[in-house]
Design a protein with these regions (language model features):
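N-terminal export signals
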Residues: 1-3, 9-31
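Generic hydrophobic alpha-helical segments
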Residues: 17-21, 73, 264, 380, ...
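A short, compositionally biased domain-edge/stem linker segment
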Residues: 22-35, 68, 493-496
Length: 590
């Protein structure tokens, strides 16, 4: 029997945060209204930045939830669309174990009607990104993803839906930060000599704004009654001039904008467009914390658009739920073996405030992951390694005290990047640290902030950043002024001490190929460096191997992850302090 939910009973089962704003939308033209009769009310359910979070204890929302909610609304006679604003196939082991295939299957079964690609849709490579487009039963849109060989868009810029005579257009937009927050090499030819794909942005945002405005104008030409942005841009100031607010302020024609990328909980905020017209901007946060619900109500003379965020829902589609549970079980079986015990918590966030810290300052988990790379080469591969680096954006989850499994490490390092070892100059190391520290002290996060093993350094935040970068934030040249990063020291095991970096000397530098070889986060200073060994081991396996090297096993027979039990504790004078949430003091921010 079909289950109908009244508004009263729905509000009992769904936690709803009322929108902070509603906007009036311009009435459809006389020609659009005449002969069609009254335009219908339209409901748009939306998600963003789910990042493969399908195994929740809390919050409780899942793809099964949103599938059931959509069906419930449809059974009530509502006209419903379900859309996603990007970053859905990557984030946990439930995405990376099959390159997002099961996530796309879940979205297909849940009844998604449309999506736009986020930067993490490219994390498994360009070939996989394009295969995802074929596996999805729903279309993708992006007005600014360009094939430079043909000059054409890879995807349609808009999708127009005819909802009982009302035409709703969605304009897809992908963040230009994709180049550096995914892997720039994926956008290049096989020899990595030139870019063959582009995500239009521009230093001043002009290329992005132009692409968006052209898409809006196309939607108008096709007779759209309502034009909705479906963008993966975000509102973080560090993303300027490519934020959703920047785009709205430099274009005209949007009625509302569904956003993603910055993981911001924004039920609804009005932003003035270039003509001063208010546009409703909304974002659900991340990880299925909320489902967005936008209602287009043409009842009044001008009509209104309102938004709510739904934080809980009791319904679950049985088919979608079964697919998710089977996959969770499979992954847990593959990765569930316990390998160690954490006697304390390892953090990517500030232990006191809960605010994410890993992209701007040292933490004990940042130290641990970097140490894992360092120890892997020195102890397992038995290859001399002077220094290891790990980008903060590649460290994704706090780890509570208790049992560690392969799955734990996969949750922390879900990208599938591979460790490598290179011979570089001290000058290249200095350039990398300077580039990584360019936002330090500003309050802006940087996925390329470098955690280190076998090294210490200072960041002098009062000194302005003068590193040269291109419009895609890829490194172009050394700092032209006084460097912010100073007193870089490299650990010397024979001396049992840290000694000053020699710019002219060659060092063995370890890290992930994402950073050292594939221009990830824009690290181009290592181009042409001598490769000692590549494709050594996947990121989470490097971390797992390090955990299993610890001592301290007691009655449980498992290594205990304390500073004293680390194999690096045998290195005289090596800085270790996993008991301190803020790390061992390798990075000093002044």
């Amino acid at each position: 029997m079909k289950r109908f939910i009244s508004r009263r009973s729905f509000l009992k089962t769904a936690g709803v945060t009322t929108a902070a704003a509603a906007v009036a939308v311009g009435a459809p033209s006389a020609s659009a209204c005449f002969g069609k009769g009254k335009l219908p009310e339209i409901t748009i359910l939306y998600t963003n930045d789910v990042h493969t979070y399908i195994d929740h204890k809390s919050p409780e929302l899942t793809y099964a939830s949103i599938a059931a909610l959509k069906k419930s609304y449809e059974e009530q006679g509502k006209n419903v669309l379900l859309v996603d604003a990007g970053d859905h196939i990557q984030g946990t082991a439930y995405g990376s174990m099959d390159d997002g295939a099961t996530i796309i299957r879940l979205m297909n079964e849940a009844g998604y009607d449309l999506a736009t690609p986020g930067n993490h849709e490219f994390d498994y490579g360009m070939d996989r990104a394009k295969m995802v487009l074929k596996e999805a039963d729903f279309p993708y849109v992006s007005c600014n993803w360009i094939d430079l060989r043909s000059g054409l868009r890879v995807l349609p810029s808009i999708k127009l839906f005819n909802i009982k005579g009302a035409f709703v257009a969605f304009v897809g937009i992908t963040t230009p930060e994709t180049f550096t927050k995914s892997t720039p090499a994926y956008f290049m030819n096989a020899k990595q000599t030139r870019y063959i794909y582009d995500i239009l942005g521009g230093d001043d945002g002009a290329k992005l704004y132009d692409a968006v405005q052209k898409a809006i104008d196309k939607a108008k030409t096709l007779g759209a009654d309502y034009i909705i942005g479906l963008g993966h841009l975000g509102v973080d100031p560090s993303s300027a001039p490519w934020t959703s607010k920047d785009v709205i302020a430099h274009t005209t024609g949007f009625n509302a904008f569904i956003d993603g990328h910055s993981h911001t909980v924004m039920a609804g905020e009005t932003v003035a467009d270039a003509a001063g017209t208010p546009v409703l901007l909304t974002q659900t946060g991340s990880y299925f914390k909320n489902i967005g619900c936008m209602t287009i109500n043409p009842e009044s003379a001008v009509g209104t658009i309102t938004t709510t965020l739904i934080s809980t829902y009791e319904g679950a589609d049985p088919v979608v739920d079964a697919i998710a549970k089977e996959w969770v079980g499979d992954v847990d079986d593959m990765l569930g073996e316990e390998i160690a015990v954490g006697d304390g918590e390892f953090y990517i966030s500030d232990a006191e405030t809960g605010k994410r810290r890993i992209r701007s300052a040292e933490t004990n988990l940042g130290d641990f992951v970097a140490d894992g790379i360092y120890a892997y080469f020195n102890e397992i591969e038995e290859l001399h390694c002077d220094i290891a680096v790990m980008n903060g954006g590649g460290i994704r989850a706090d780890v509570p005290a208790g049992a560690w499994s392969f799955k734990t490490c996969k949750m922390v390092s879900p990208f599938g990047n591979v460790a490598c070892l290179m011979s570089v100059t001290g000058k290249q190391i200095q350039d990398a640290l300077e580039f990584a520290a360019r936002f330090a002290g500003s309050g802006q996060e940087n996925g390329g902030f470098l955690h280190v093993a076998g090294a210490t350094y200072e960041i002098h935040t009062e000194i302005p950043n003068t590193v040269l970068t291109d419009e895609k934030n890829v490194w172009l040249g050394s700092a032209t002024g006084t460097p912010r990063v100073q007193n870089v020291k490299i650990y010397d095991k024979a001396l049992g001490d840290y000694v000053p970096l020699d710019p002219e000397r060659k060092y063995a530098l370890a890290g992930m190929n994402y950073t050292l070889r594939n221009l990830g986060d824009g690290f181009a200073m290592f181009d042409g460096a001598e490769l000692i060994k590549d494709y050594v081991s996947e990121d989470y396996l490097v971390m797992s191997s390090y955990a299993m090297m610890f001592g301290g096993a007691d009655g449980d027979g498992l290594p205990h992850l304390t500073s004293a039990n680390s194999p690096l504790a045998d290195y005289p004078g090596y800085l270790l302090d996993y008991e301190n949430p803020y790390g061992a003091g390798r990075i000093t921010i002044l």
